[in-house]
Amino acid sequence: MKKIITICAFAACLTGCDDLFEPAIENNLGLEYMYENSQYAEGILANAYTRIPCAGYSFNDVATDDAVSNDAENSWRKIASGMWTANNNPADRWTSCRSAIQYINLFLANADKVKWAKDEVVAQMFCDREKAEAYGLRAMYMYYLLEAHAGYTEDGVLMGVPILTEPEVAGSNFNVPRSTFVDCMKALKEDARLALEGLPWEYGDAAEMQRLAAKYAGADQGKVTRVFGTNFIGRMSGKVVEAFVAKADLLAASPAYSDQSGIDWKTAAASAAKVLNHIGGVDGMDPTGWTWYCNADDIENLSPTESPAEILWRGERAKSLSLEEDNFPPTLYGNGRINPTQNLVDAFPMLNGYPVSQSSEYDENLPYANRDPRLEAYILYNGGKAGNTNKEIFTAADGTTNDALNKVVGRSTRTGYYLRKLLRQDISLDPNAKADQYHYTPRIRYTEIFLAYAEAANQAYGPQNKGGNSYSAYDVMKKLRSRAGIGRDNGDAYLESIKNDQAKMAELIRNERRIELCFEGFRFWDLRRWKSNLTEAAKGMNISGTRYTPMEVDKRSFSEYMYYGPIPYSEVLKYDELKQNQGW
């Protein structure tokens, strides 16, 4: 991963978007330079890496029933109130993803001309691996484009995006129609196939290096390690490619797309299982995976070539405190930006595993007692503790500090809750004793793939049928909930009560996905692929004395056509072959 950052910096100095369409400006390096300078060639590909959508947090939860923001200018807050249009779209990926694909296509068109190494065997291995990375990246970007821009046009056809496999130049025909969703999925899977031919499952894996070495005459251990060794961990690999295939199949099998996607739940389950089987199925689930963001020992001791067991693909580890500055409550010197909703709080079950609405142990006067441990870990509620001094935070409307409900516009909570997930509590924002800590962004967590498998397998085979694998949707739910401490005293009686009910299991799986992946950018898209209710108002909790009163905080104004995102308005205006999705 260090190598990517170096290359990106190098590429930033050498390339610009204009150079892709026009001859290089005098005194700048042209594309021909890459043929004798492999680092420059890698810089072209590195430009695609810099645009990865999962490299950070969008907090699009603010446009769902899971969160609001106290920032009136937050773009997700604005579109949730009815301001989402084809030319005001914070969910847009058209420009960034297509730009990445342009760099990928430019790289693929020139990679065979590059002198990758003096040794011919090493040079061929490098060329094949770099091209495989490019194919994997292009498959990934197709997934993100489909998630954000696929939809039904006015003629009732489910369309994807234009499929681009050659670099565009000044004389190219830019007025290219969208391809069908089916054809886009075929293109994605063909790119994935080409990627898997040249990539190891993971860099440095002995068996994988031996497999790849067999393709090249004269490839000894030293040469193979040079090309496929641990130095390249963090770049596109076989397991990352397969994970994106699983994500794409889950999207395509979902209600919003399944009528015309050509992908069913069995396919989606098989794709997820292919990833999970490499870690031993449910036995490979990380017991501490639900607190990956604050497992201090794991994070502090993480080397550039390692990832915790929970993490399939991650970004760089770096010291920072920006997340905490944005989201710590005011008395901890934060801005309290992301405020979880009562809707989300209600989604966390009781410690015994039963939903709040079905549990005799739930006490409206003590609503946070005997709850799912993930509630305390992910959401800071009234009386909860936070920060490196373990300070008690009071969010009640009659509170005396700036942490109180609506106390200070733009800083205090609007729902009665503050964000806790993703934040390091051992950070200090005190101006007199500031202390940052290491963070990293998980691009893909194994928990996401477990949840994808559970959802697809339940729909394909039912809760307990394993569908040819060694584990079922029920098995995943049992393990996932148990690791968080749910139902340990009663054998998770609620799960046992629904293990033969496909509909109730589907509801539970969706709820577990909501909890486990909250604030990581999933629910905005999940609600759409499920065709769920988009207009449930965001609620909060007004606490005064011992009285807890639920309240409405923000309405959600979305129309039914907004299950699918728009094609950018400017693009539709420029190109008449580019058909807009219905309603936009």
What are these regions, as identified by a protein language model?
Residues 18-77, 96, 131, 150-161, ...:
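An aromatic- and glycine-enriched ligand-binding surface/loop that stacks and positions planar moieties
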Residues 115-128, 256-264, 461-472:
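Structural helix-adjacent loops and short alpha-helical linkers that scaffold large soluble proteins
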Residues 97-100, 182, 187-189, 209-223, ...:
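Long, intrinsically disordered, low-complexity segments
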Residues 368, 373-480:
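C-terminal substrate/ligand-recognition segments
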Residues 141-150, 245-257, 448-462, 484:
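Extended, well-ordered alpha-helical segments in internal regulatory regions
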Residues 1-27:
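Bacterial Sec-dependent N-terminal signal peptides
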Residues 37-43, 50, 74-151, 169-186, ...:
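Conserved, well-structured interaction surfaces
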